[in-house]
């Protein structure tokens, strides 16, 4: 088929994007709900180069390729999406809000951007209602040590799920330490110009405010075990 005929079917730039060796794995990651930030240099540069054409490509599946103000990319499904999806749990989203709060904190710079799972858990208990958190784990929770242990395990699971979405990077093979990416702004408060974003995020957490429906994070329906384990740093 001549190049002229190809252009009648699809733009040459889109054909180049689909033929690029980066595309298959990147496409799979985006469809799984992963956010692609500046840390993923090659993938991010690829999306920057072909954004206009890939937006048209994904529109055929009734999803939008979004570039957030912070620079990261993700797919936002419409109600008629052809890509399977599921919504994050309430605890997953609460952990995401805490991560966003930590991202905005002075401690991020002091710690070179590295936090521990224990720091995440402690901040969660400081800012959120512990009784409500325990109810997310066990609706009949009495506040026992067993329930608290289960909550901590669930928080670890939520953190790992958010890692698979590109929200955090584990430090090498040490899953107890992680670095937060700008993608956590998916969980950020919508603040007016002049507001303190960290204080707005604190209110969002304490008030238990739900995220707007259009900002709900979507996952595909595959199990975590089937997801690529790519969220690590050396």
From Swiss-Prot:
User: Keywords of this protein's UniProt record, alphabetized?
Assistant: Cell cycle, Cell division, Chromosome partition, Cytoplasm, DNA condensation
Q: Does the keyword Cytoplasm apply?
A: yes
- One Pfam entry for this protein is MukE
Gene Ontology terms: biological process: cell division; chromosome condensation; chromosome segregation; DNA replication
KW Cell cycle (keyword) present: yes
Primary subcellular site in the record, as a coarse category: cytoplasm
Bias-annotated ranges (Acidic residues)? 221-234
Kindly give the InterPro entries that the UniProt entry links to this protein: MukE_C, MukE_N, Scp_MukE
| Record Gene3D superfamilies | 1.10.10.2250, MukE-like family, C-terminal domain
Region Disordered: what ranges? 207-234
Per UniProt, subcellular location reads as: Cytoplasm, Nucleoid
One cellular component (GO) term of this entry: condensin complex
Protein family according to the UniProt entry: Belongs to the MukE family.
User: Record's HAMAP family?
Assistant: MukE (MF_01802)
The protein's job, in short, is: Involved in chromosome condensation, segregation and cell cycle progression. May participate in facilitating chromosome segregation by condensation DNA from both sides of a centrally located replisome during cell division. Probably acts via its interaction with MukB and MukF.
* Quaternary organization: Forms a hexameric complex with MukF, (MukF-(MukE)2)2, which forms a ternary complex with MukB. The complex formation is stimulated by calcium or magnesium.
Annotated protein name in UniProt: Chromosome partition protein MukE
Which organism encodes this protein?
A: Escherichia coli (strain K12)
């Amino acid at each position: 088929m001549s190049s002229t005929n190809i252009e009648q079917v699809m733009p040459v730039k889109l054909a180049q994007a689909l033929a690029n060796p980066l595309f298959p794995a990147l496409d799979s990651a985006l469809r799984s709900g992963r956010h692609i930030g500046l840390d993923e240099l090659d993938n991010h540069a690829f999306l920057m180069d072909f954004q206009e054409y890939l937006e048209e490509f994904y529109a055929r599946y009734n999803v939008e390729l979004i570039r957030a103000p912070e620079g990261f990319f993700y797919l936002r499904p419409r109600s008629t999406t052809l890509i399977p999806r599921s919504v994050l749990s309430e605890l997953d989203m609460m952990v995401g809000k805490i991560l966003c709060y930590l991202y905005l904190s002075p401690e991020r710079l002091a710690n070179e951007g590295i936090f521990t799972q224990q720091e995440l858990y402690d901040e969660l208990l400081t800012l959120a209602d512990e009784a409500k958190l325990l109810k997310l784990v066990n609706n009949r929770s009495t506040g026992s040590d067993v329930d608290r242990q289960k909550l901590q395990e669930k928080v670890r699971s939520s953190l790992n799920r958010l890692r698979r979405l590109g929200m955090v990077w584990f430090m090498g093979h040490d899953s107890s330490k992680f670095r937060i990416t700008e993608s956590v702004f998916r969980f950020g408060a919508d603040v007016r110009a002049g507001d303190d974003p960290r204080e707005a995020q604190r209110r969002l957490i304490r008030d238990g405010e739900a995220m707007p429906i259009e900002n709900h994070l979507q996952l595909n329906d595959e199990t975590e075990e089937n997801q690529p384990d790519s969220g690590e740093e050396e």
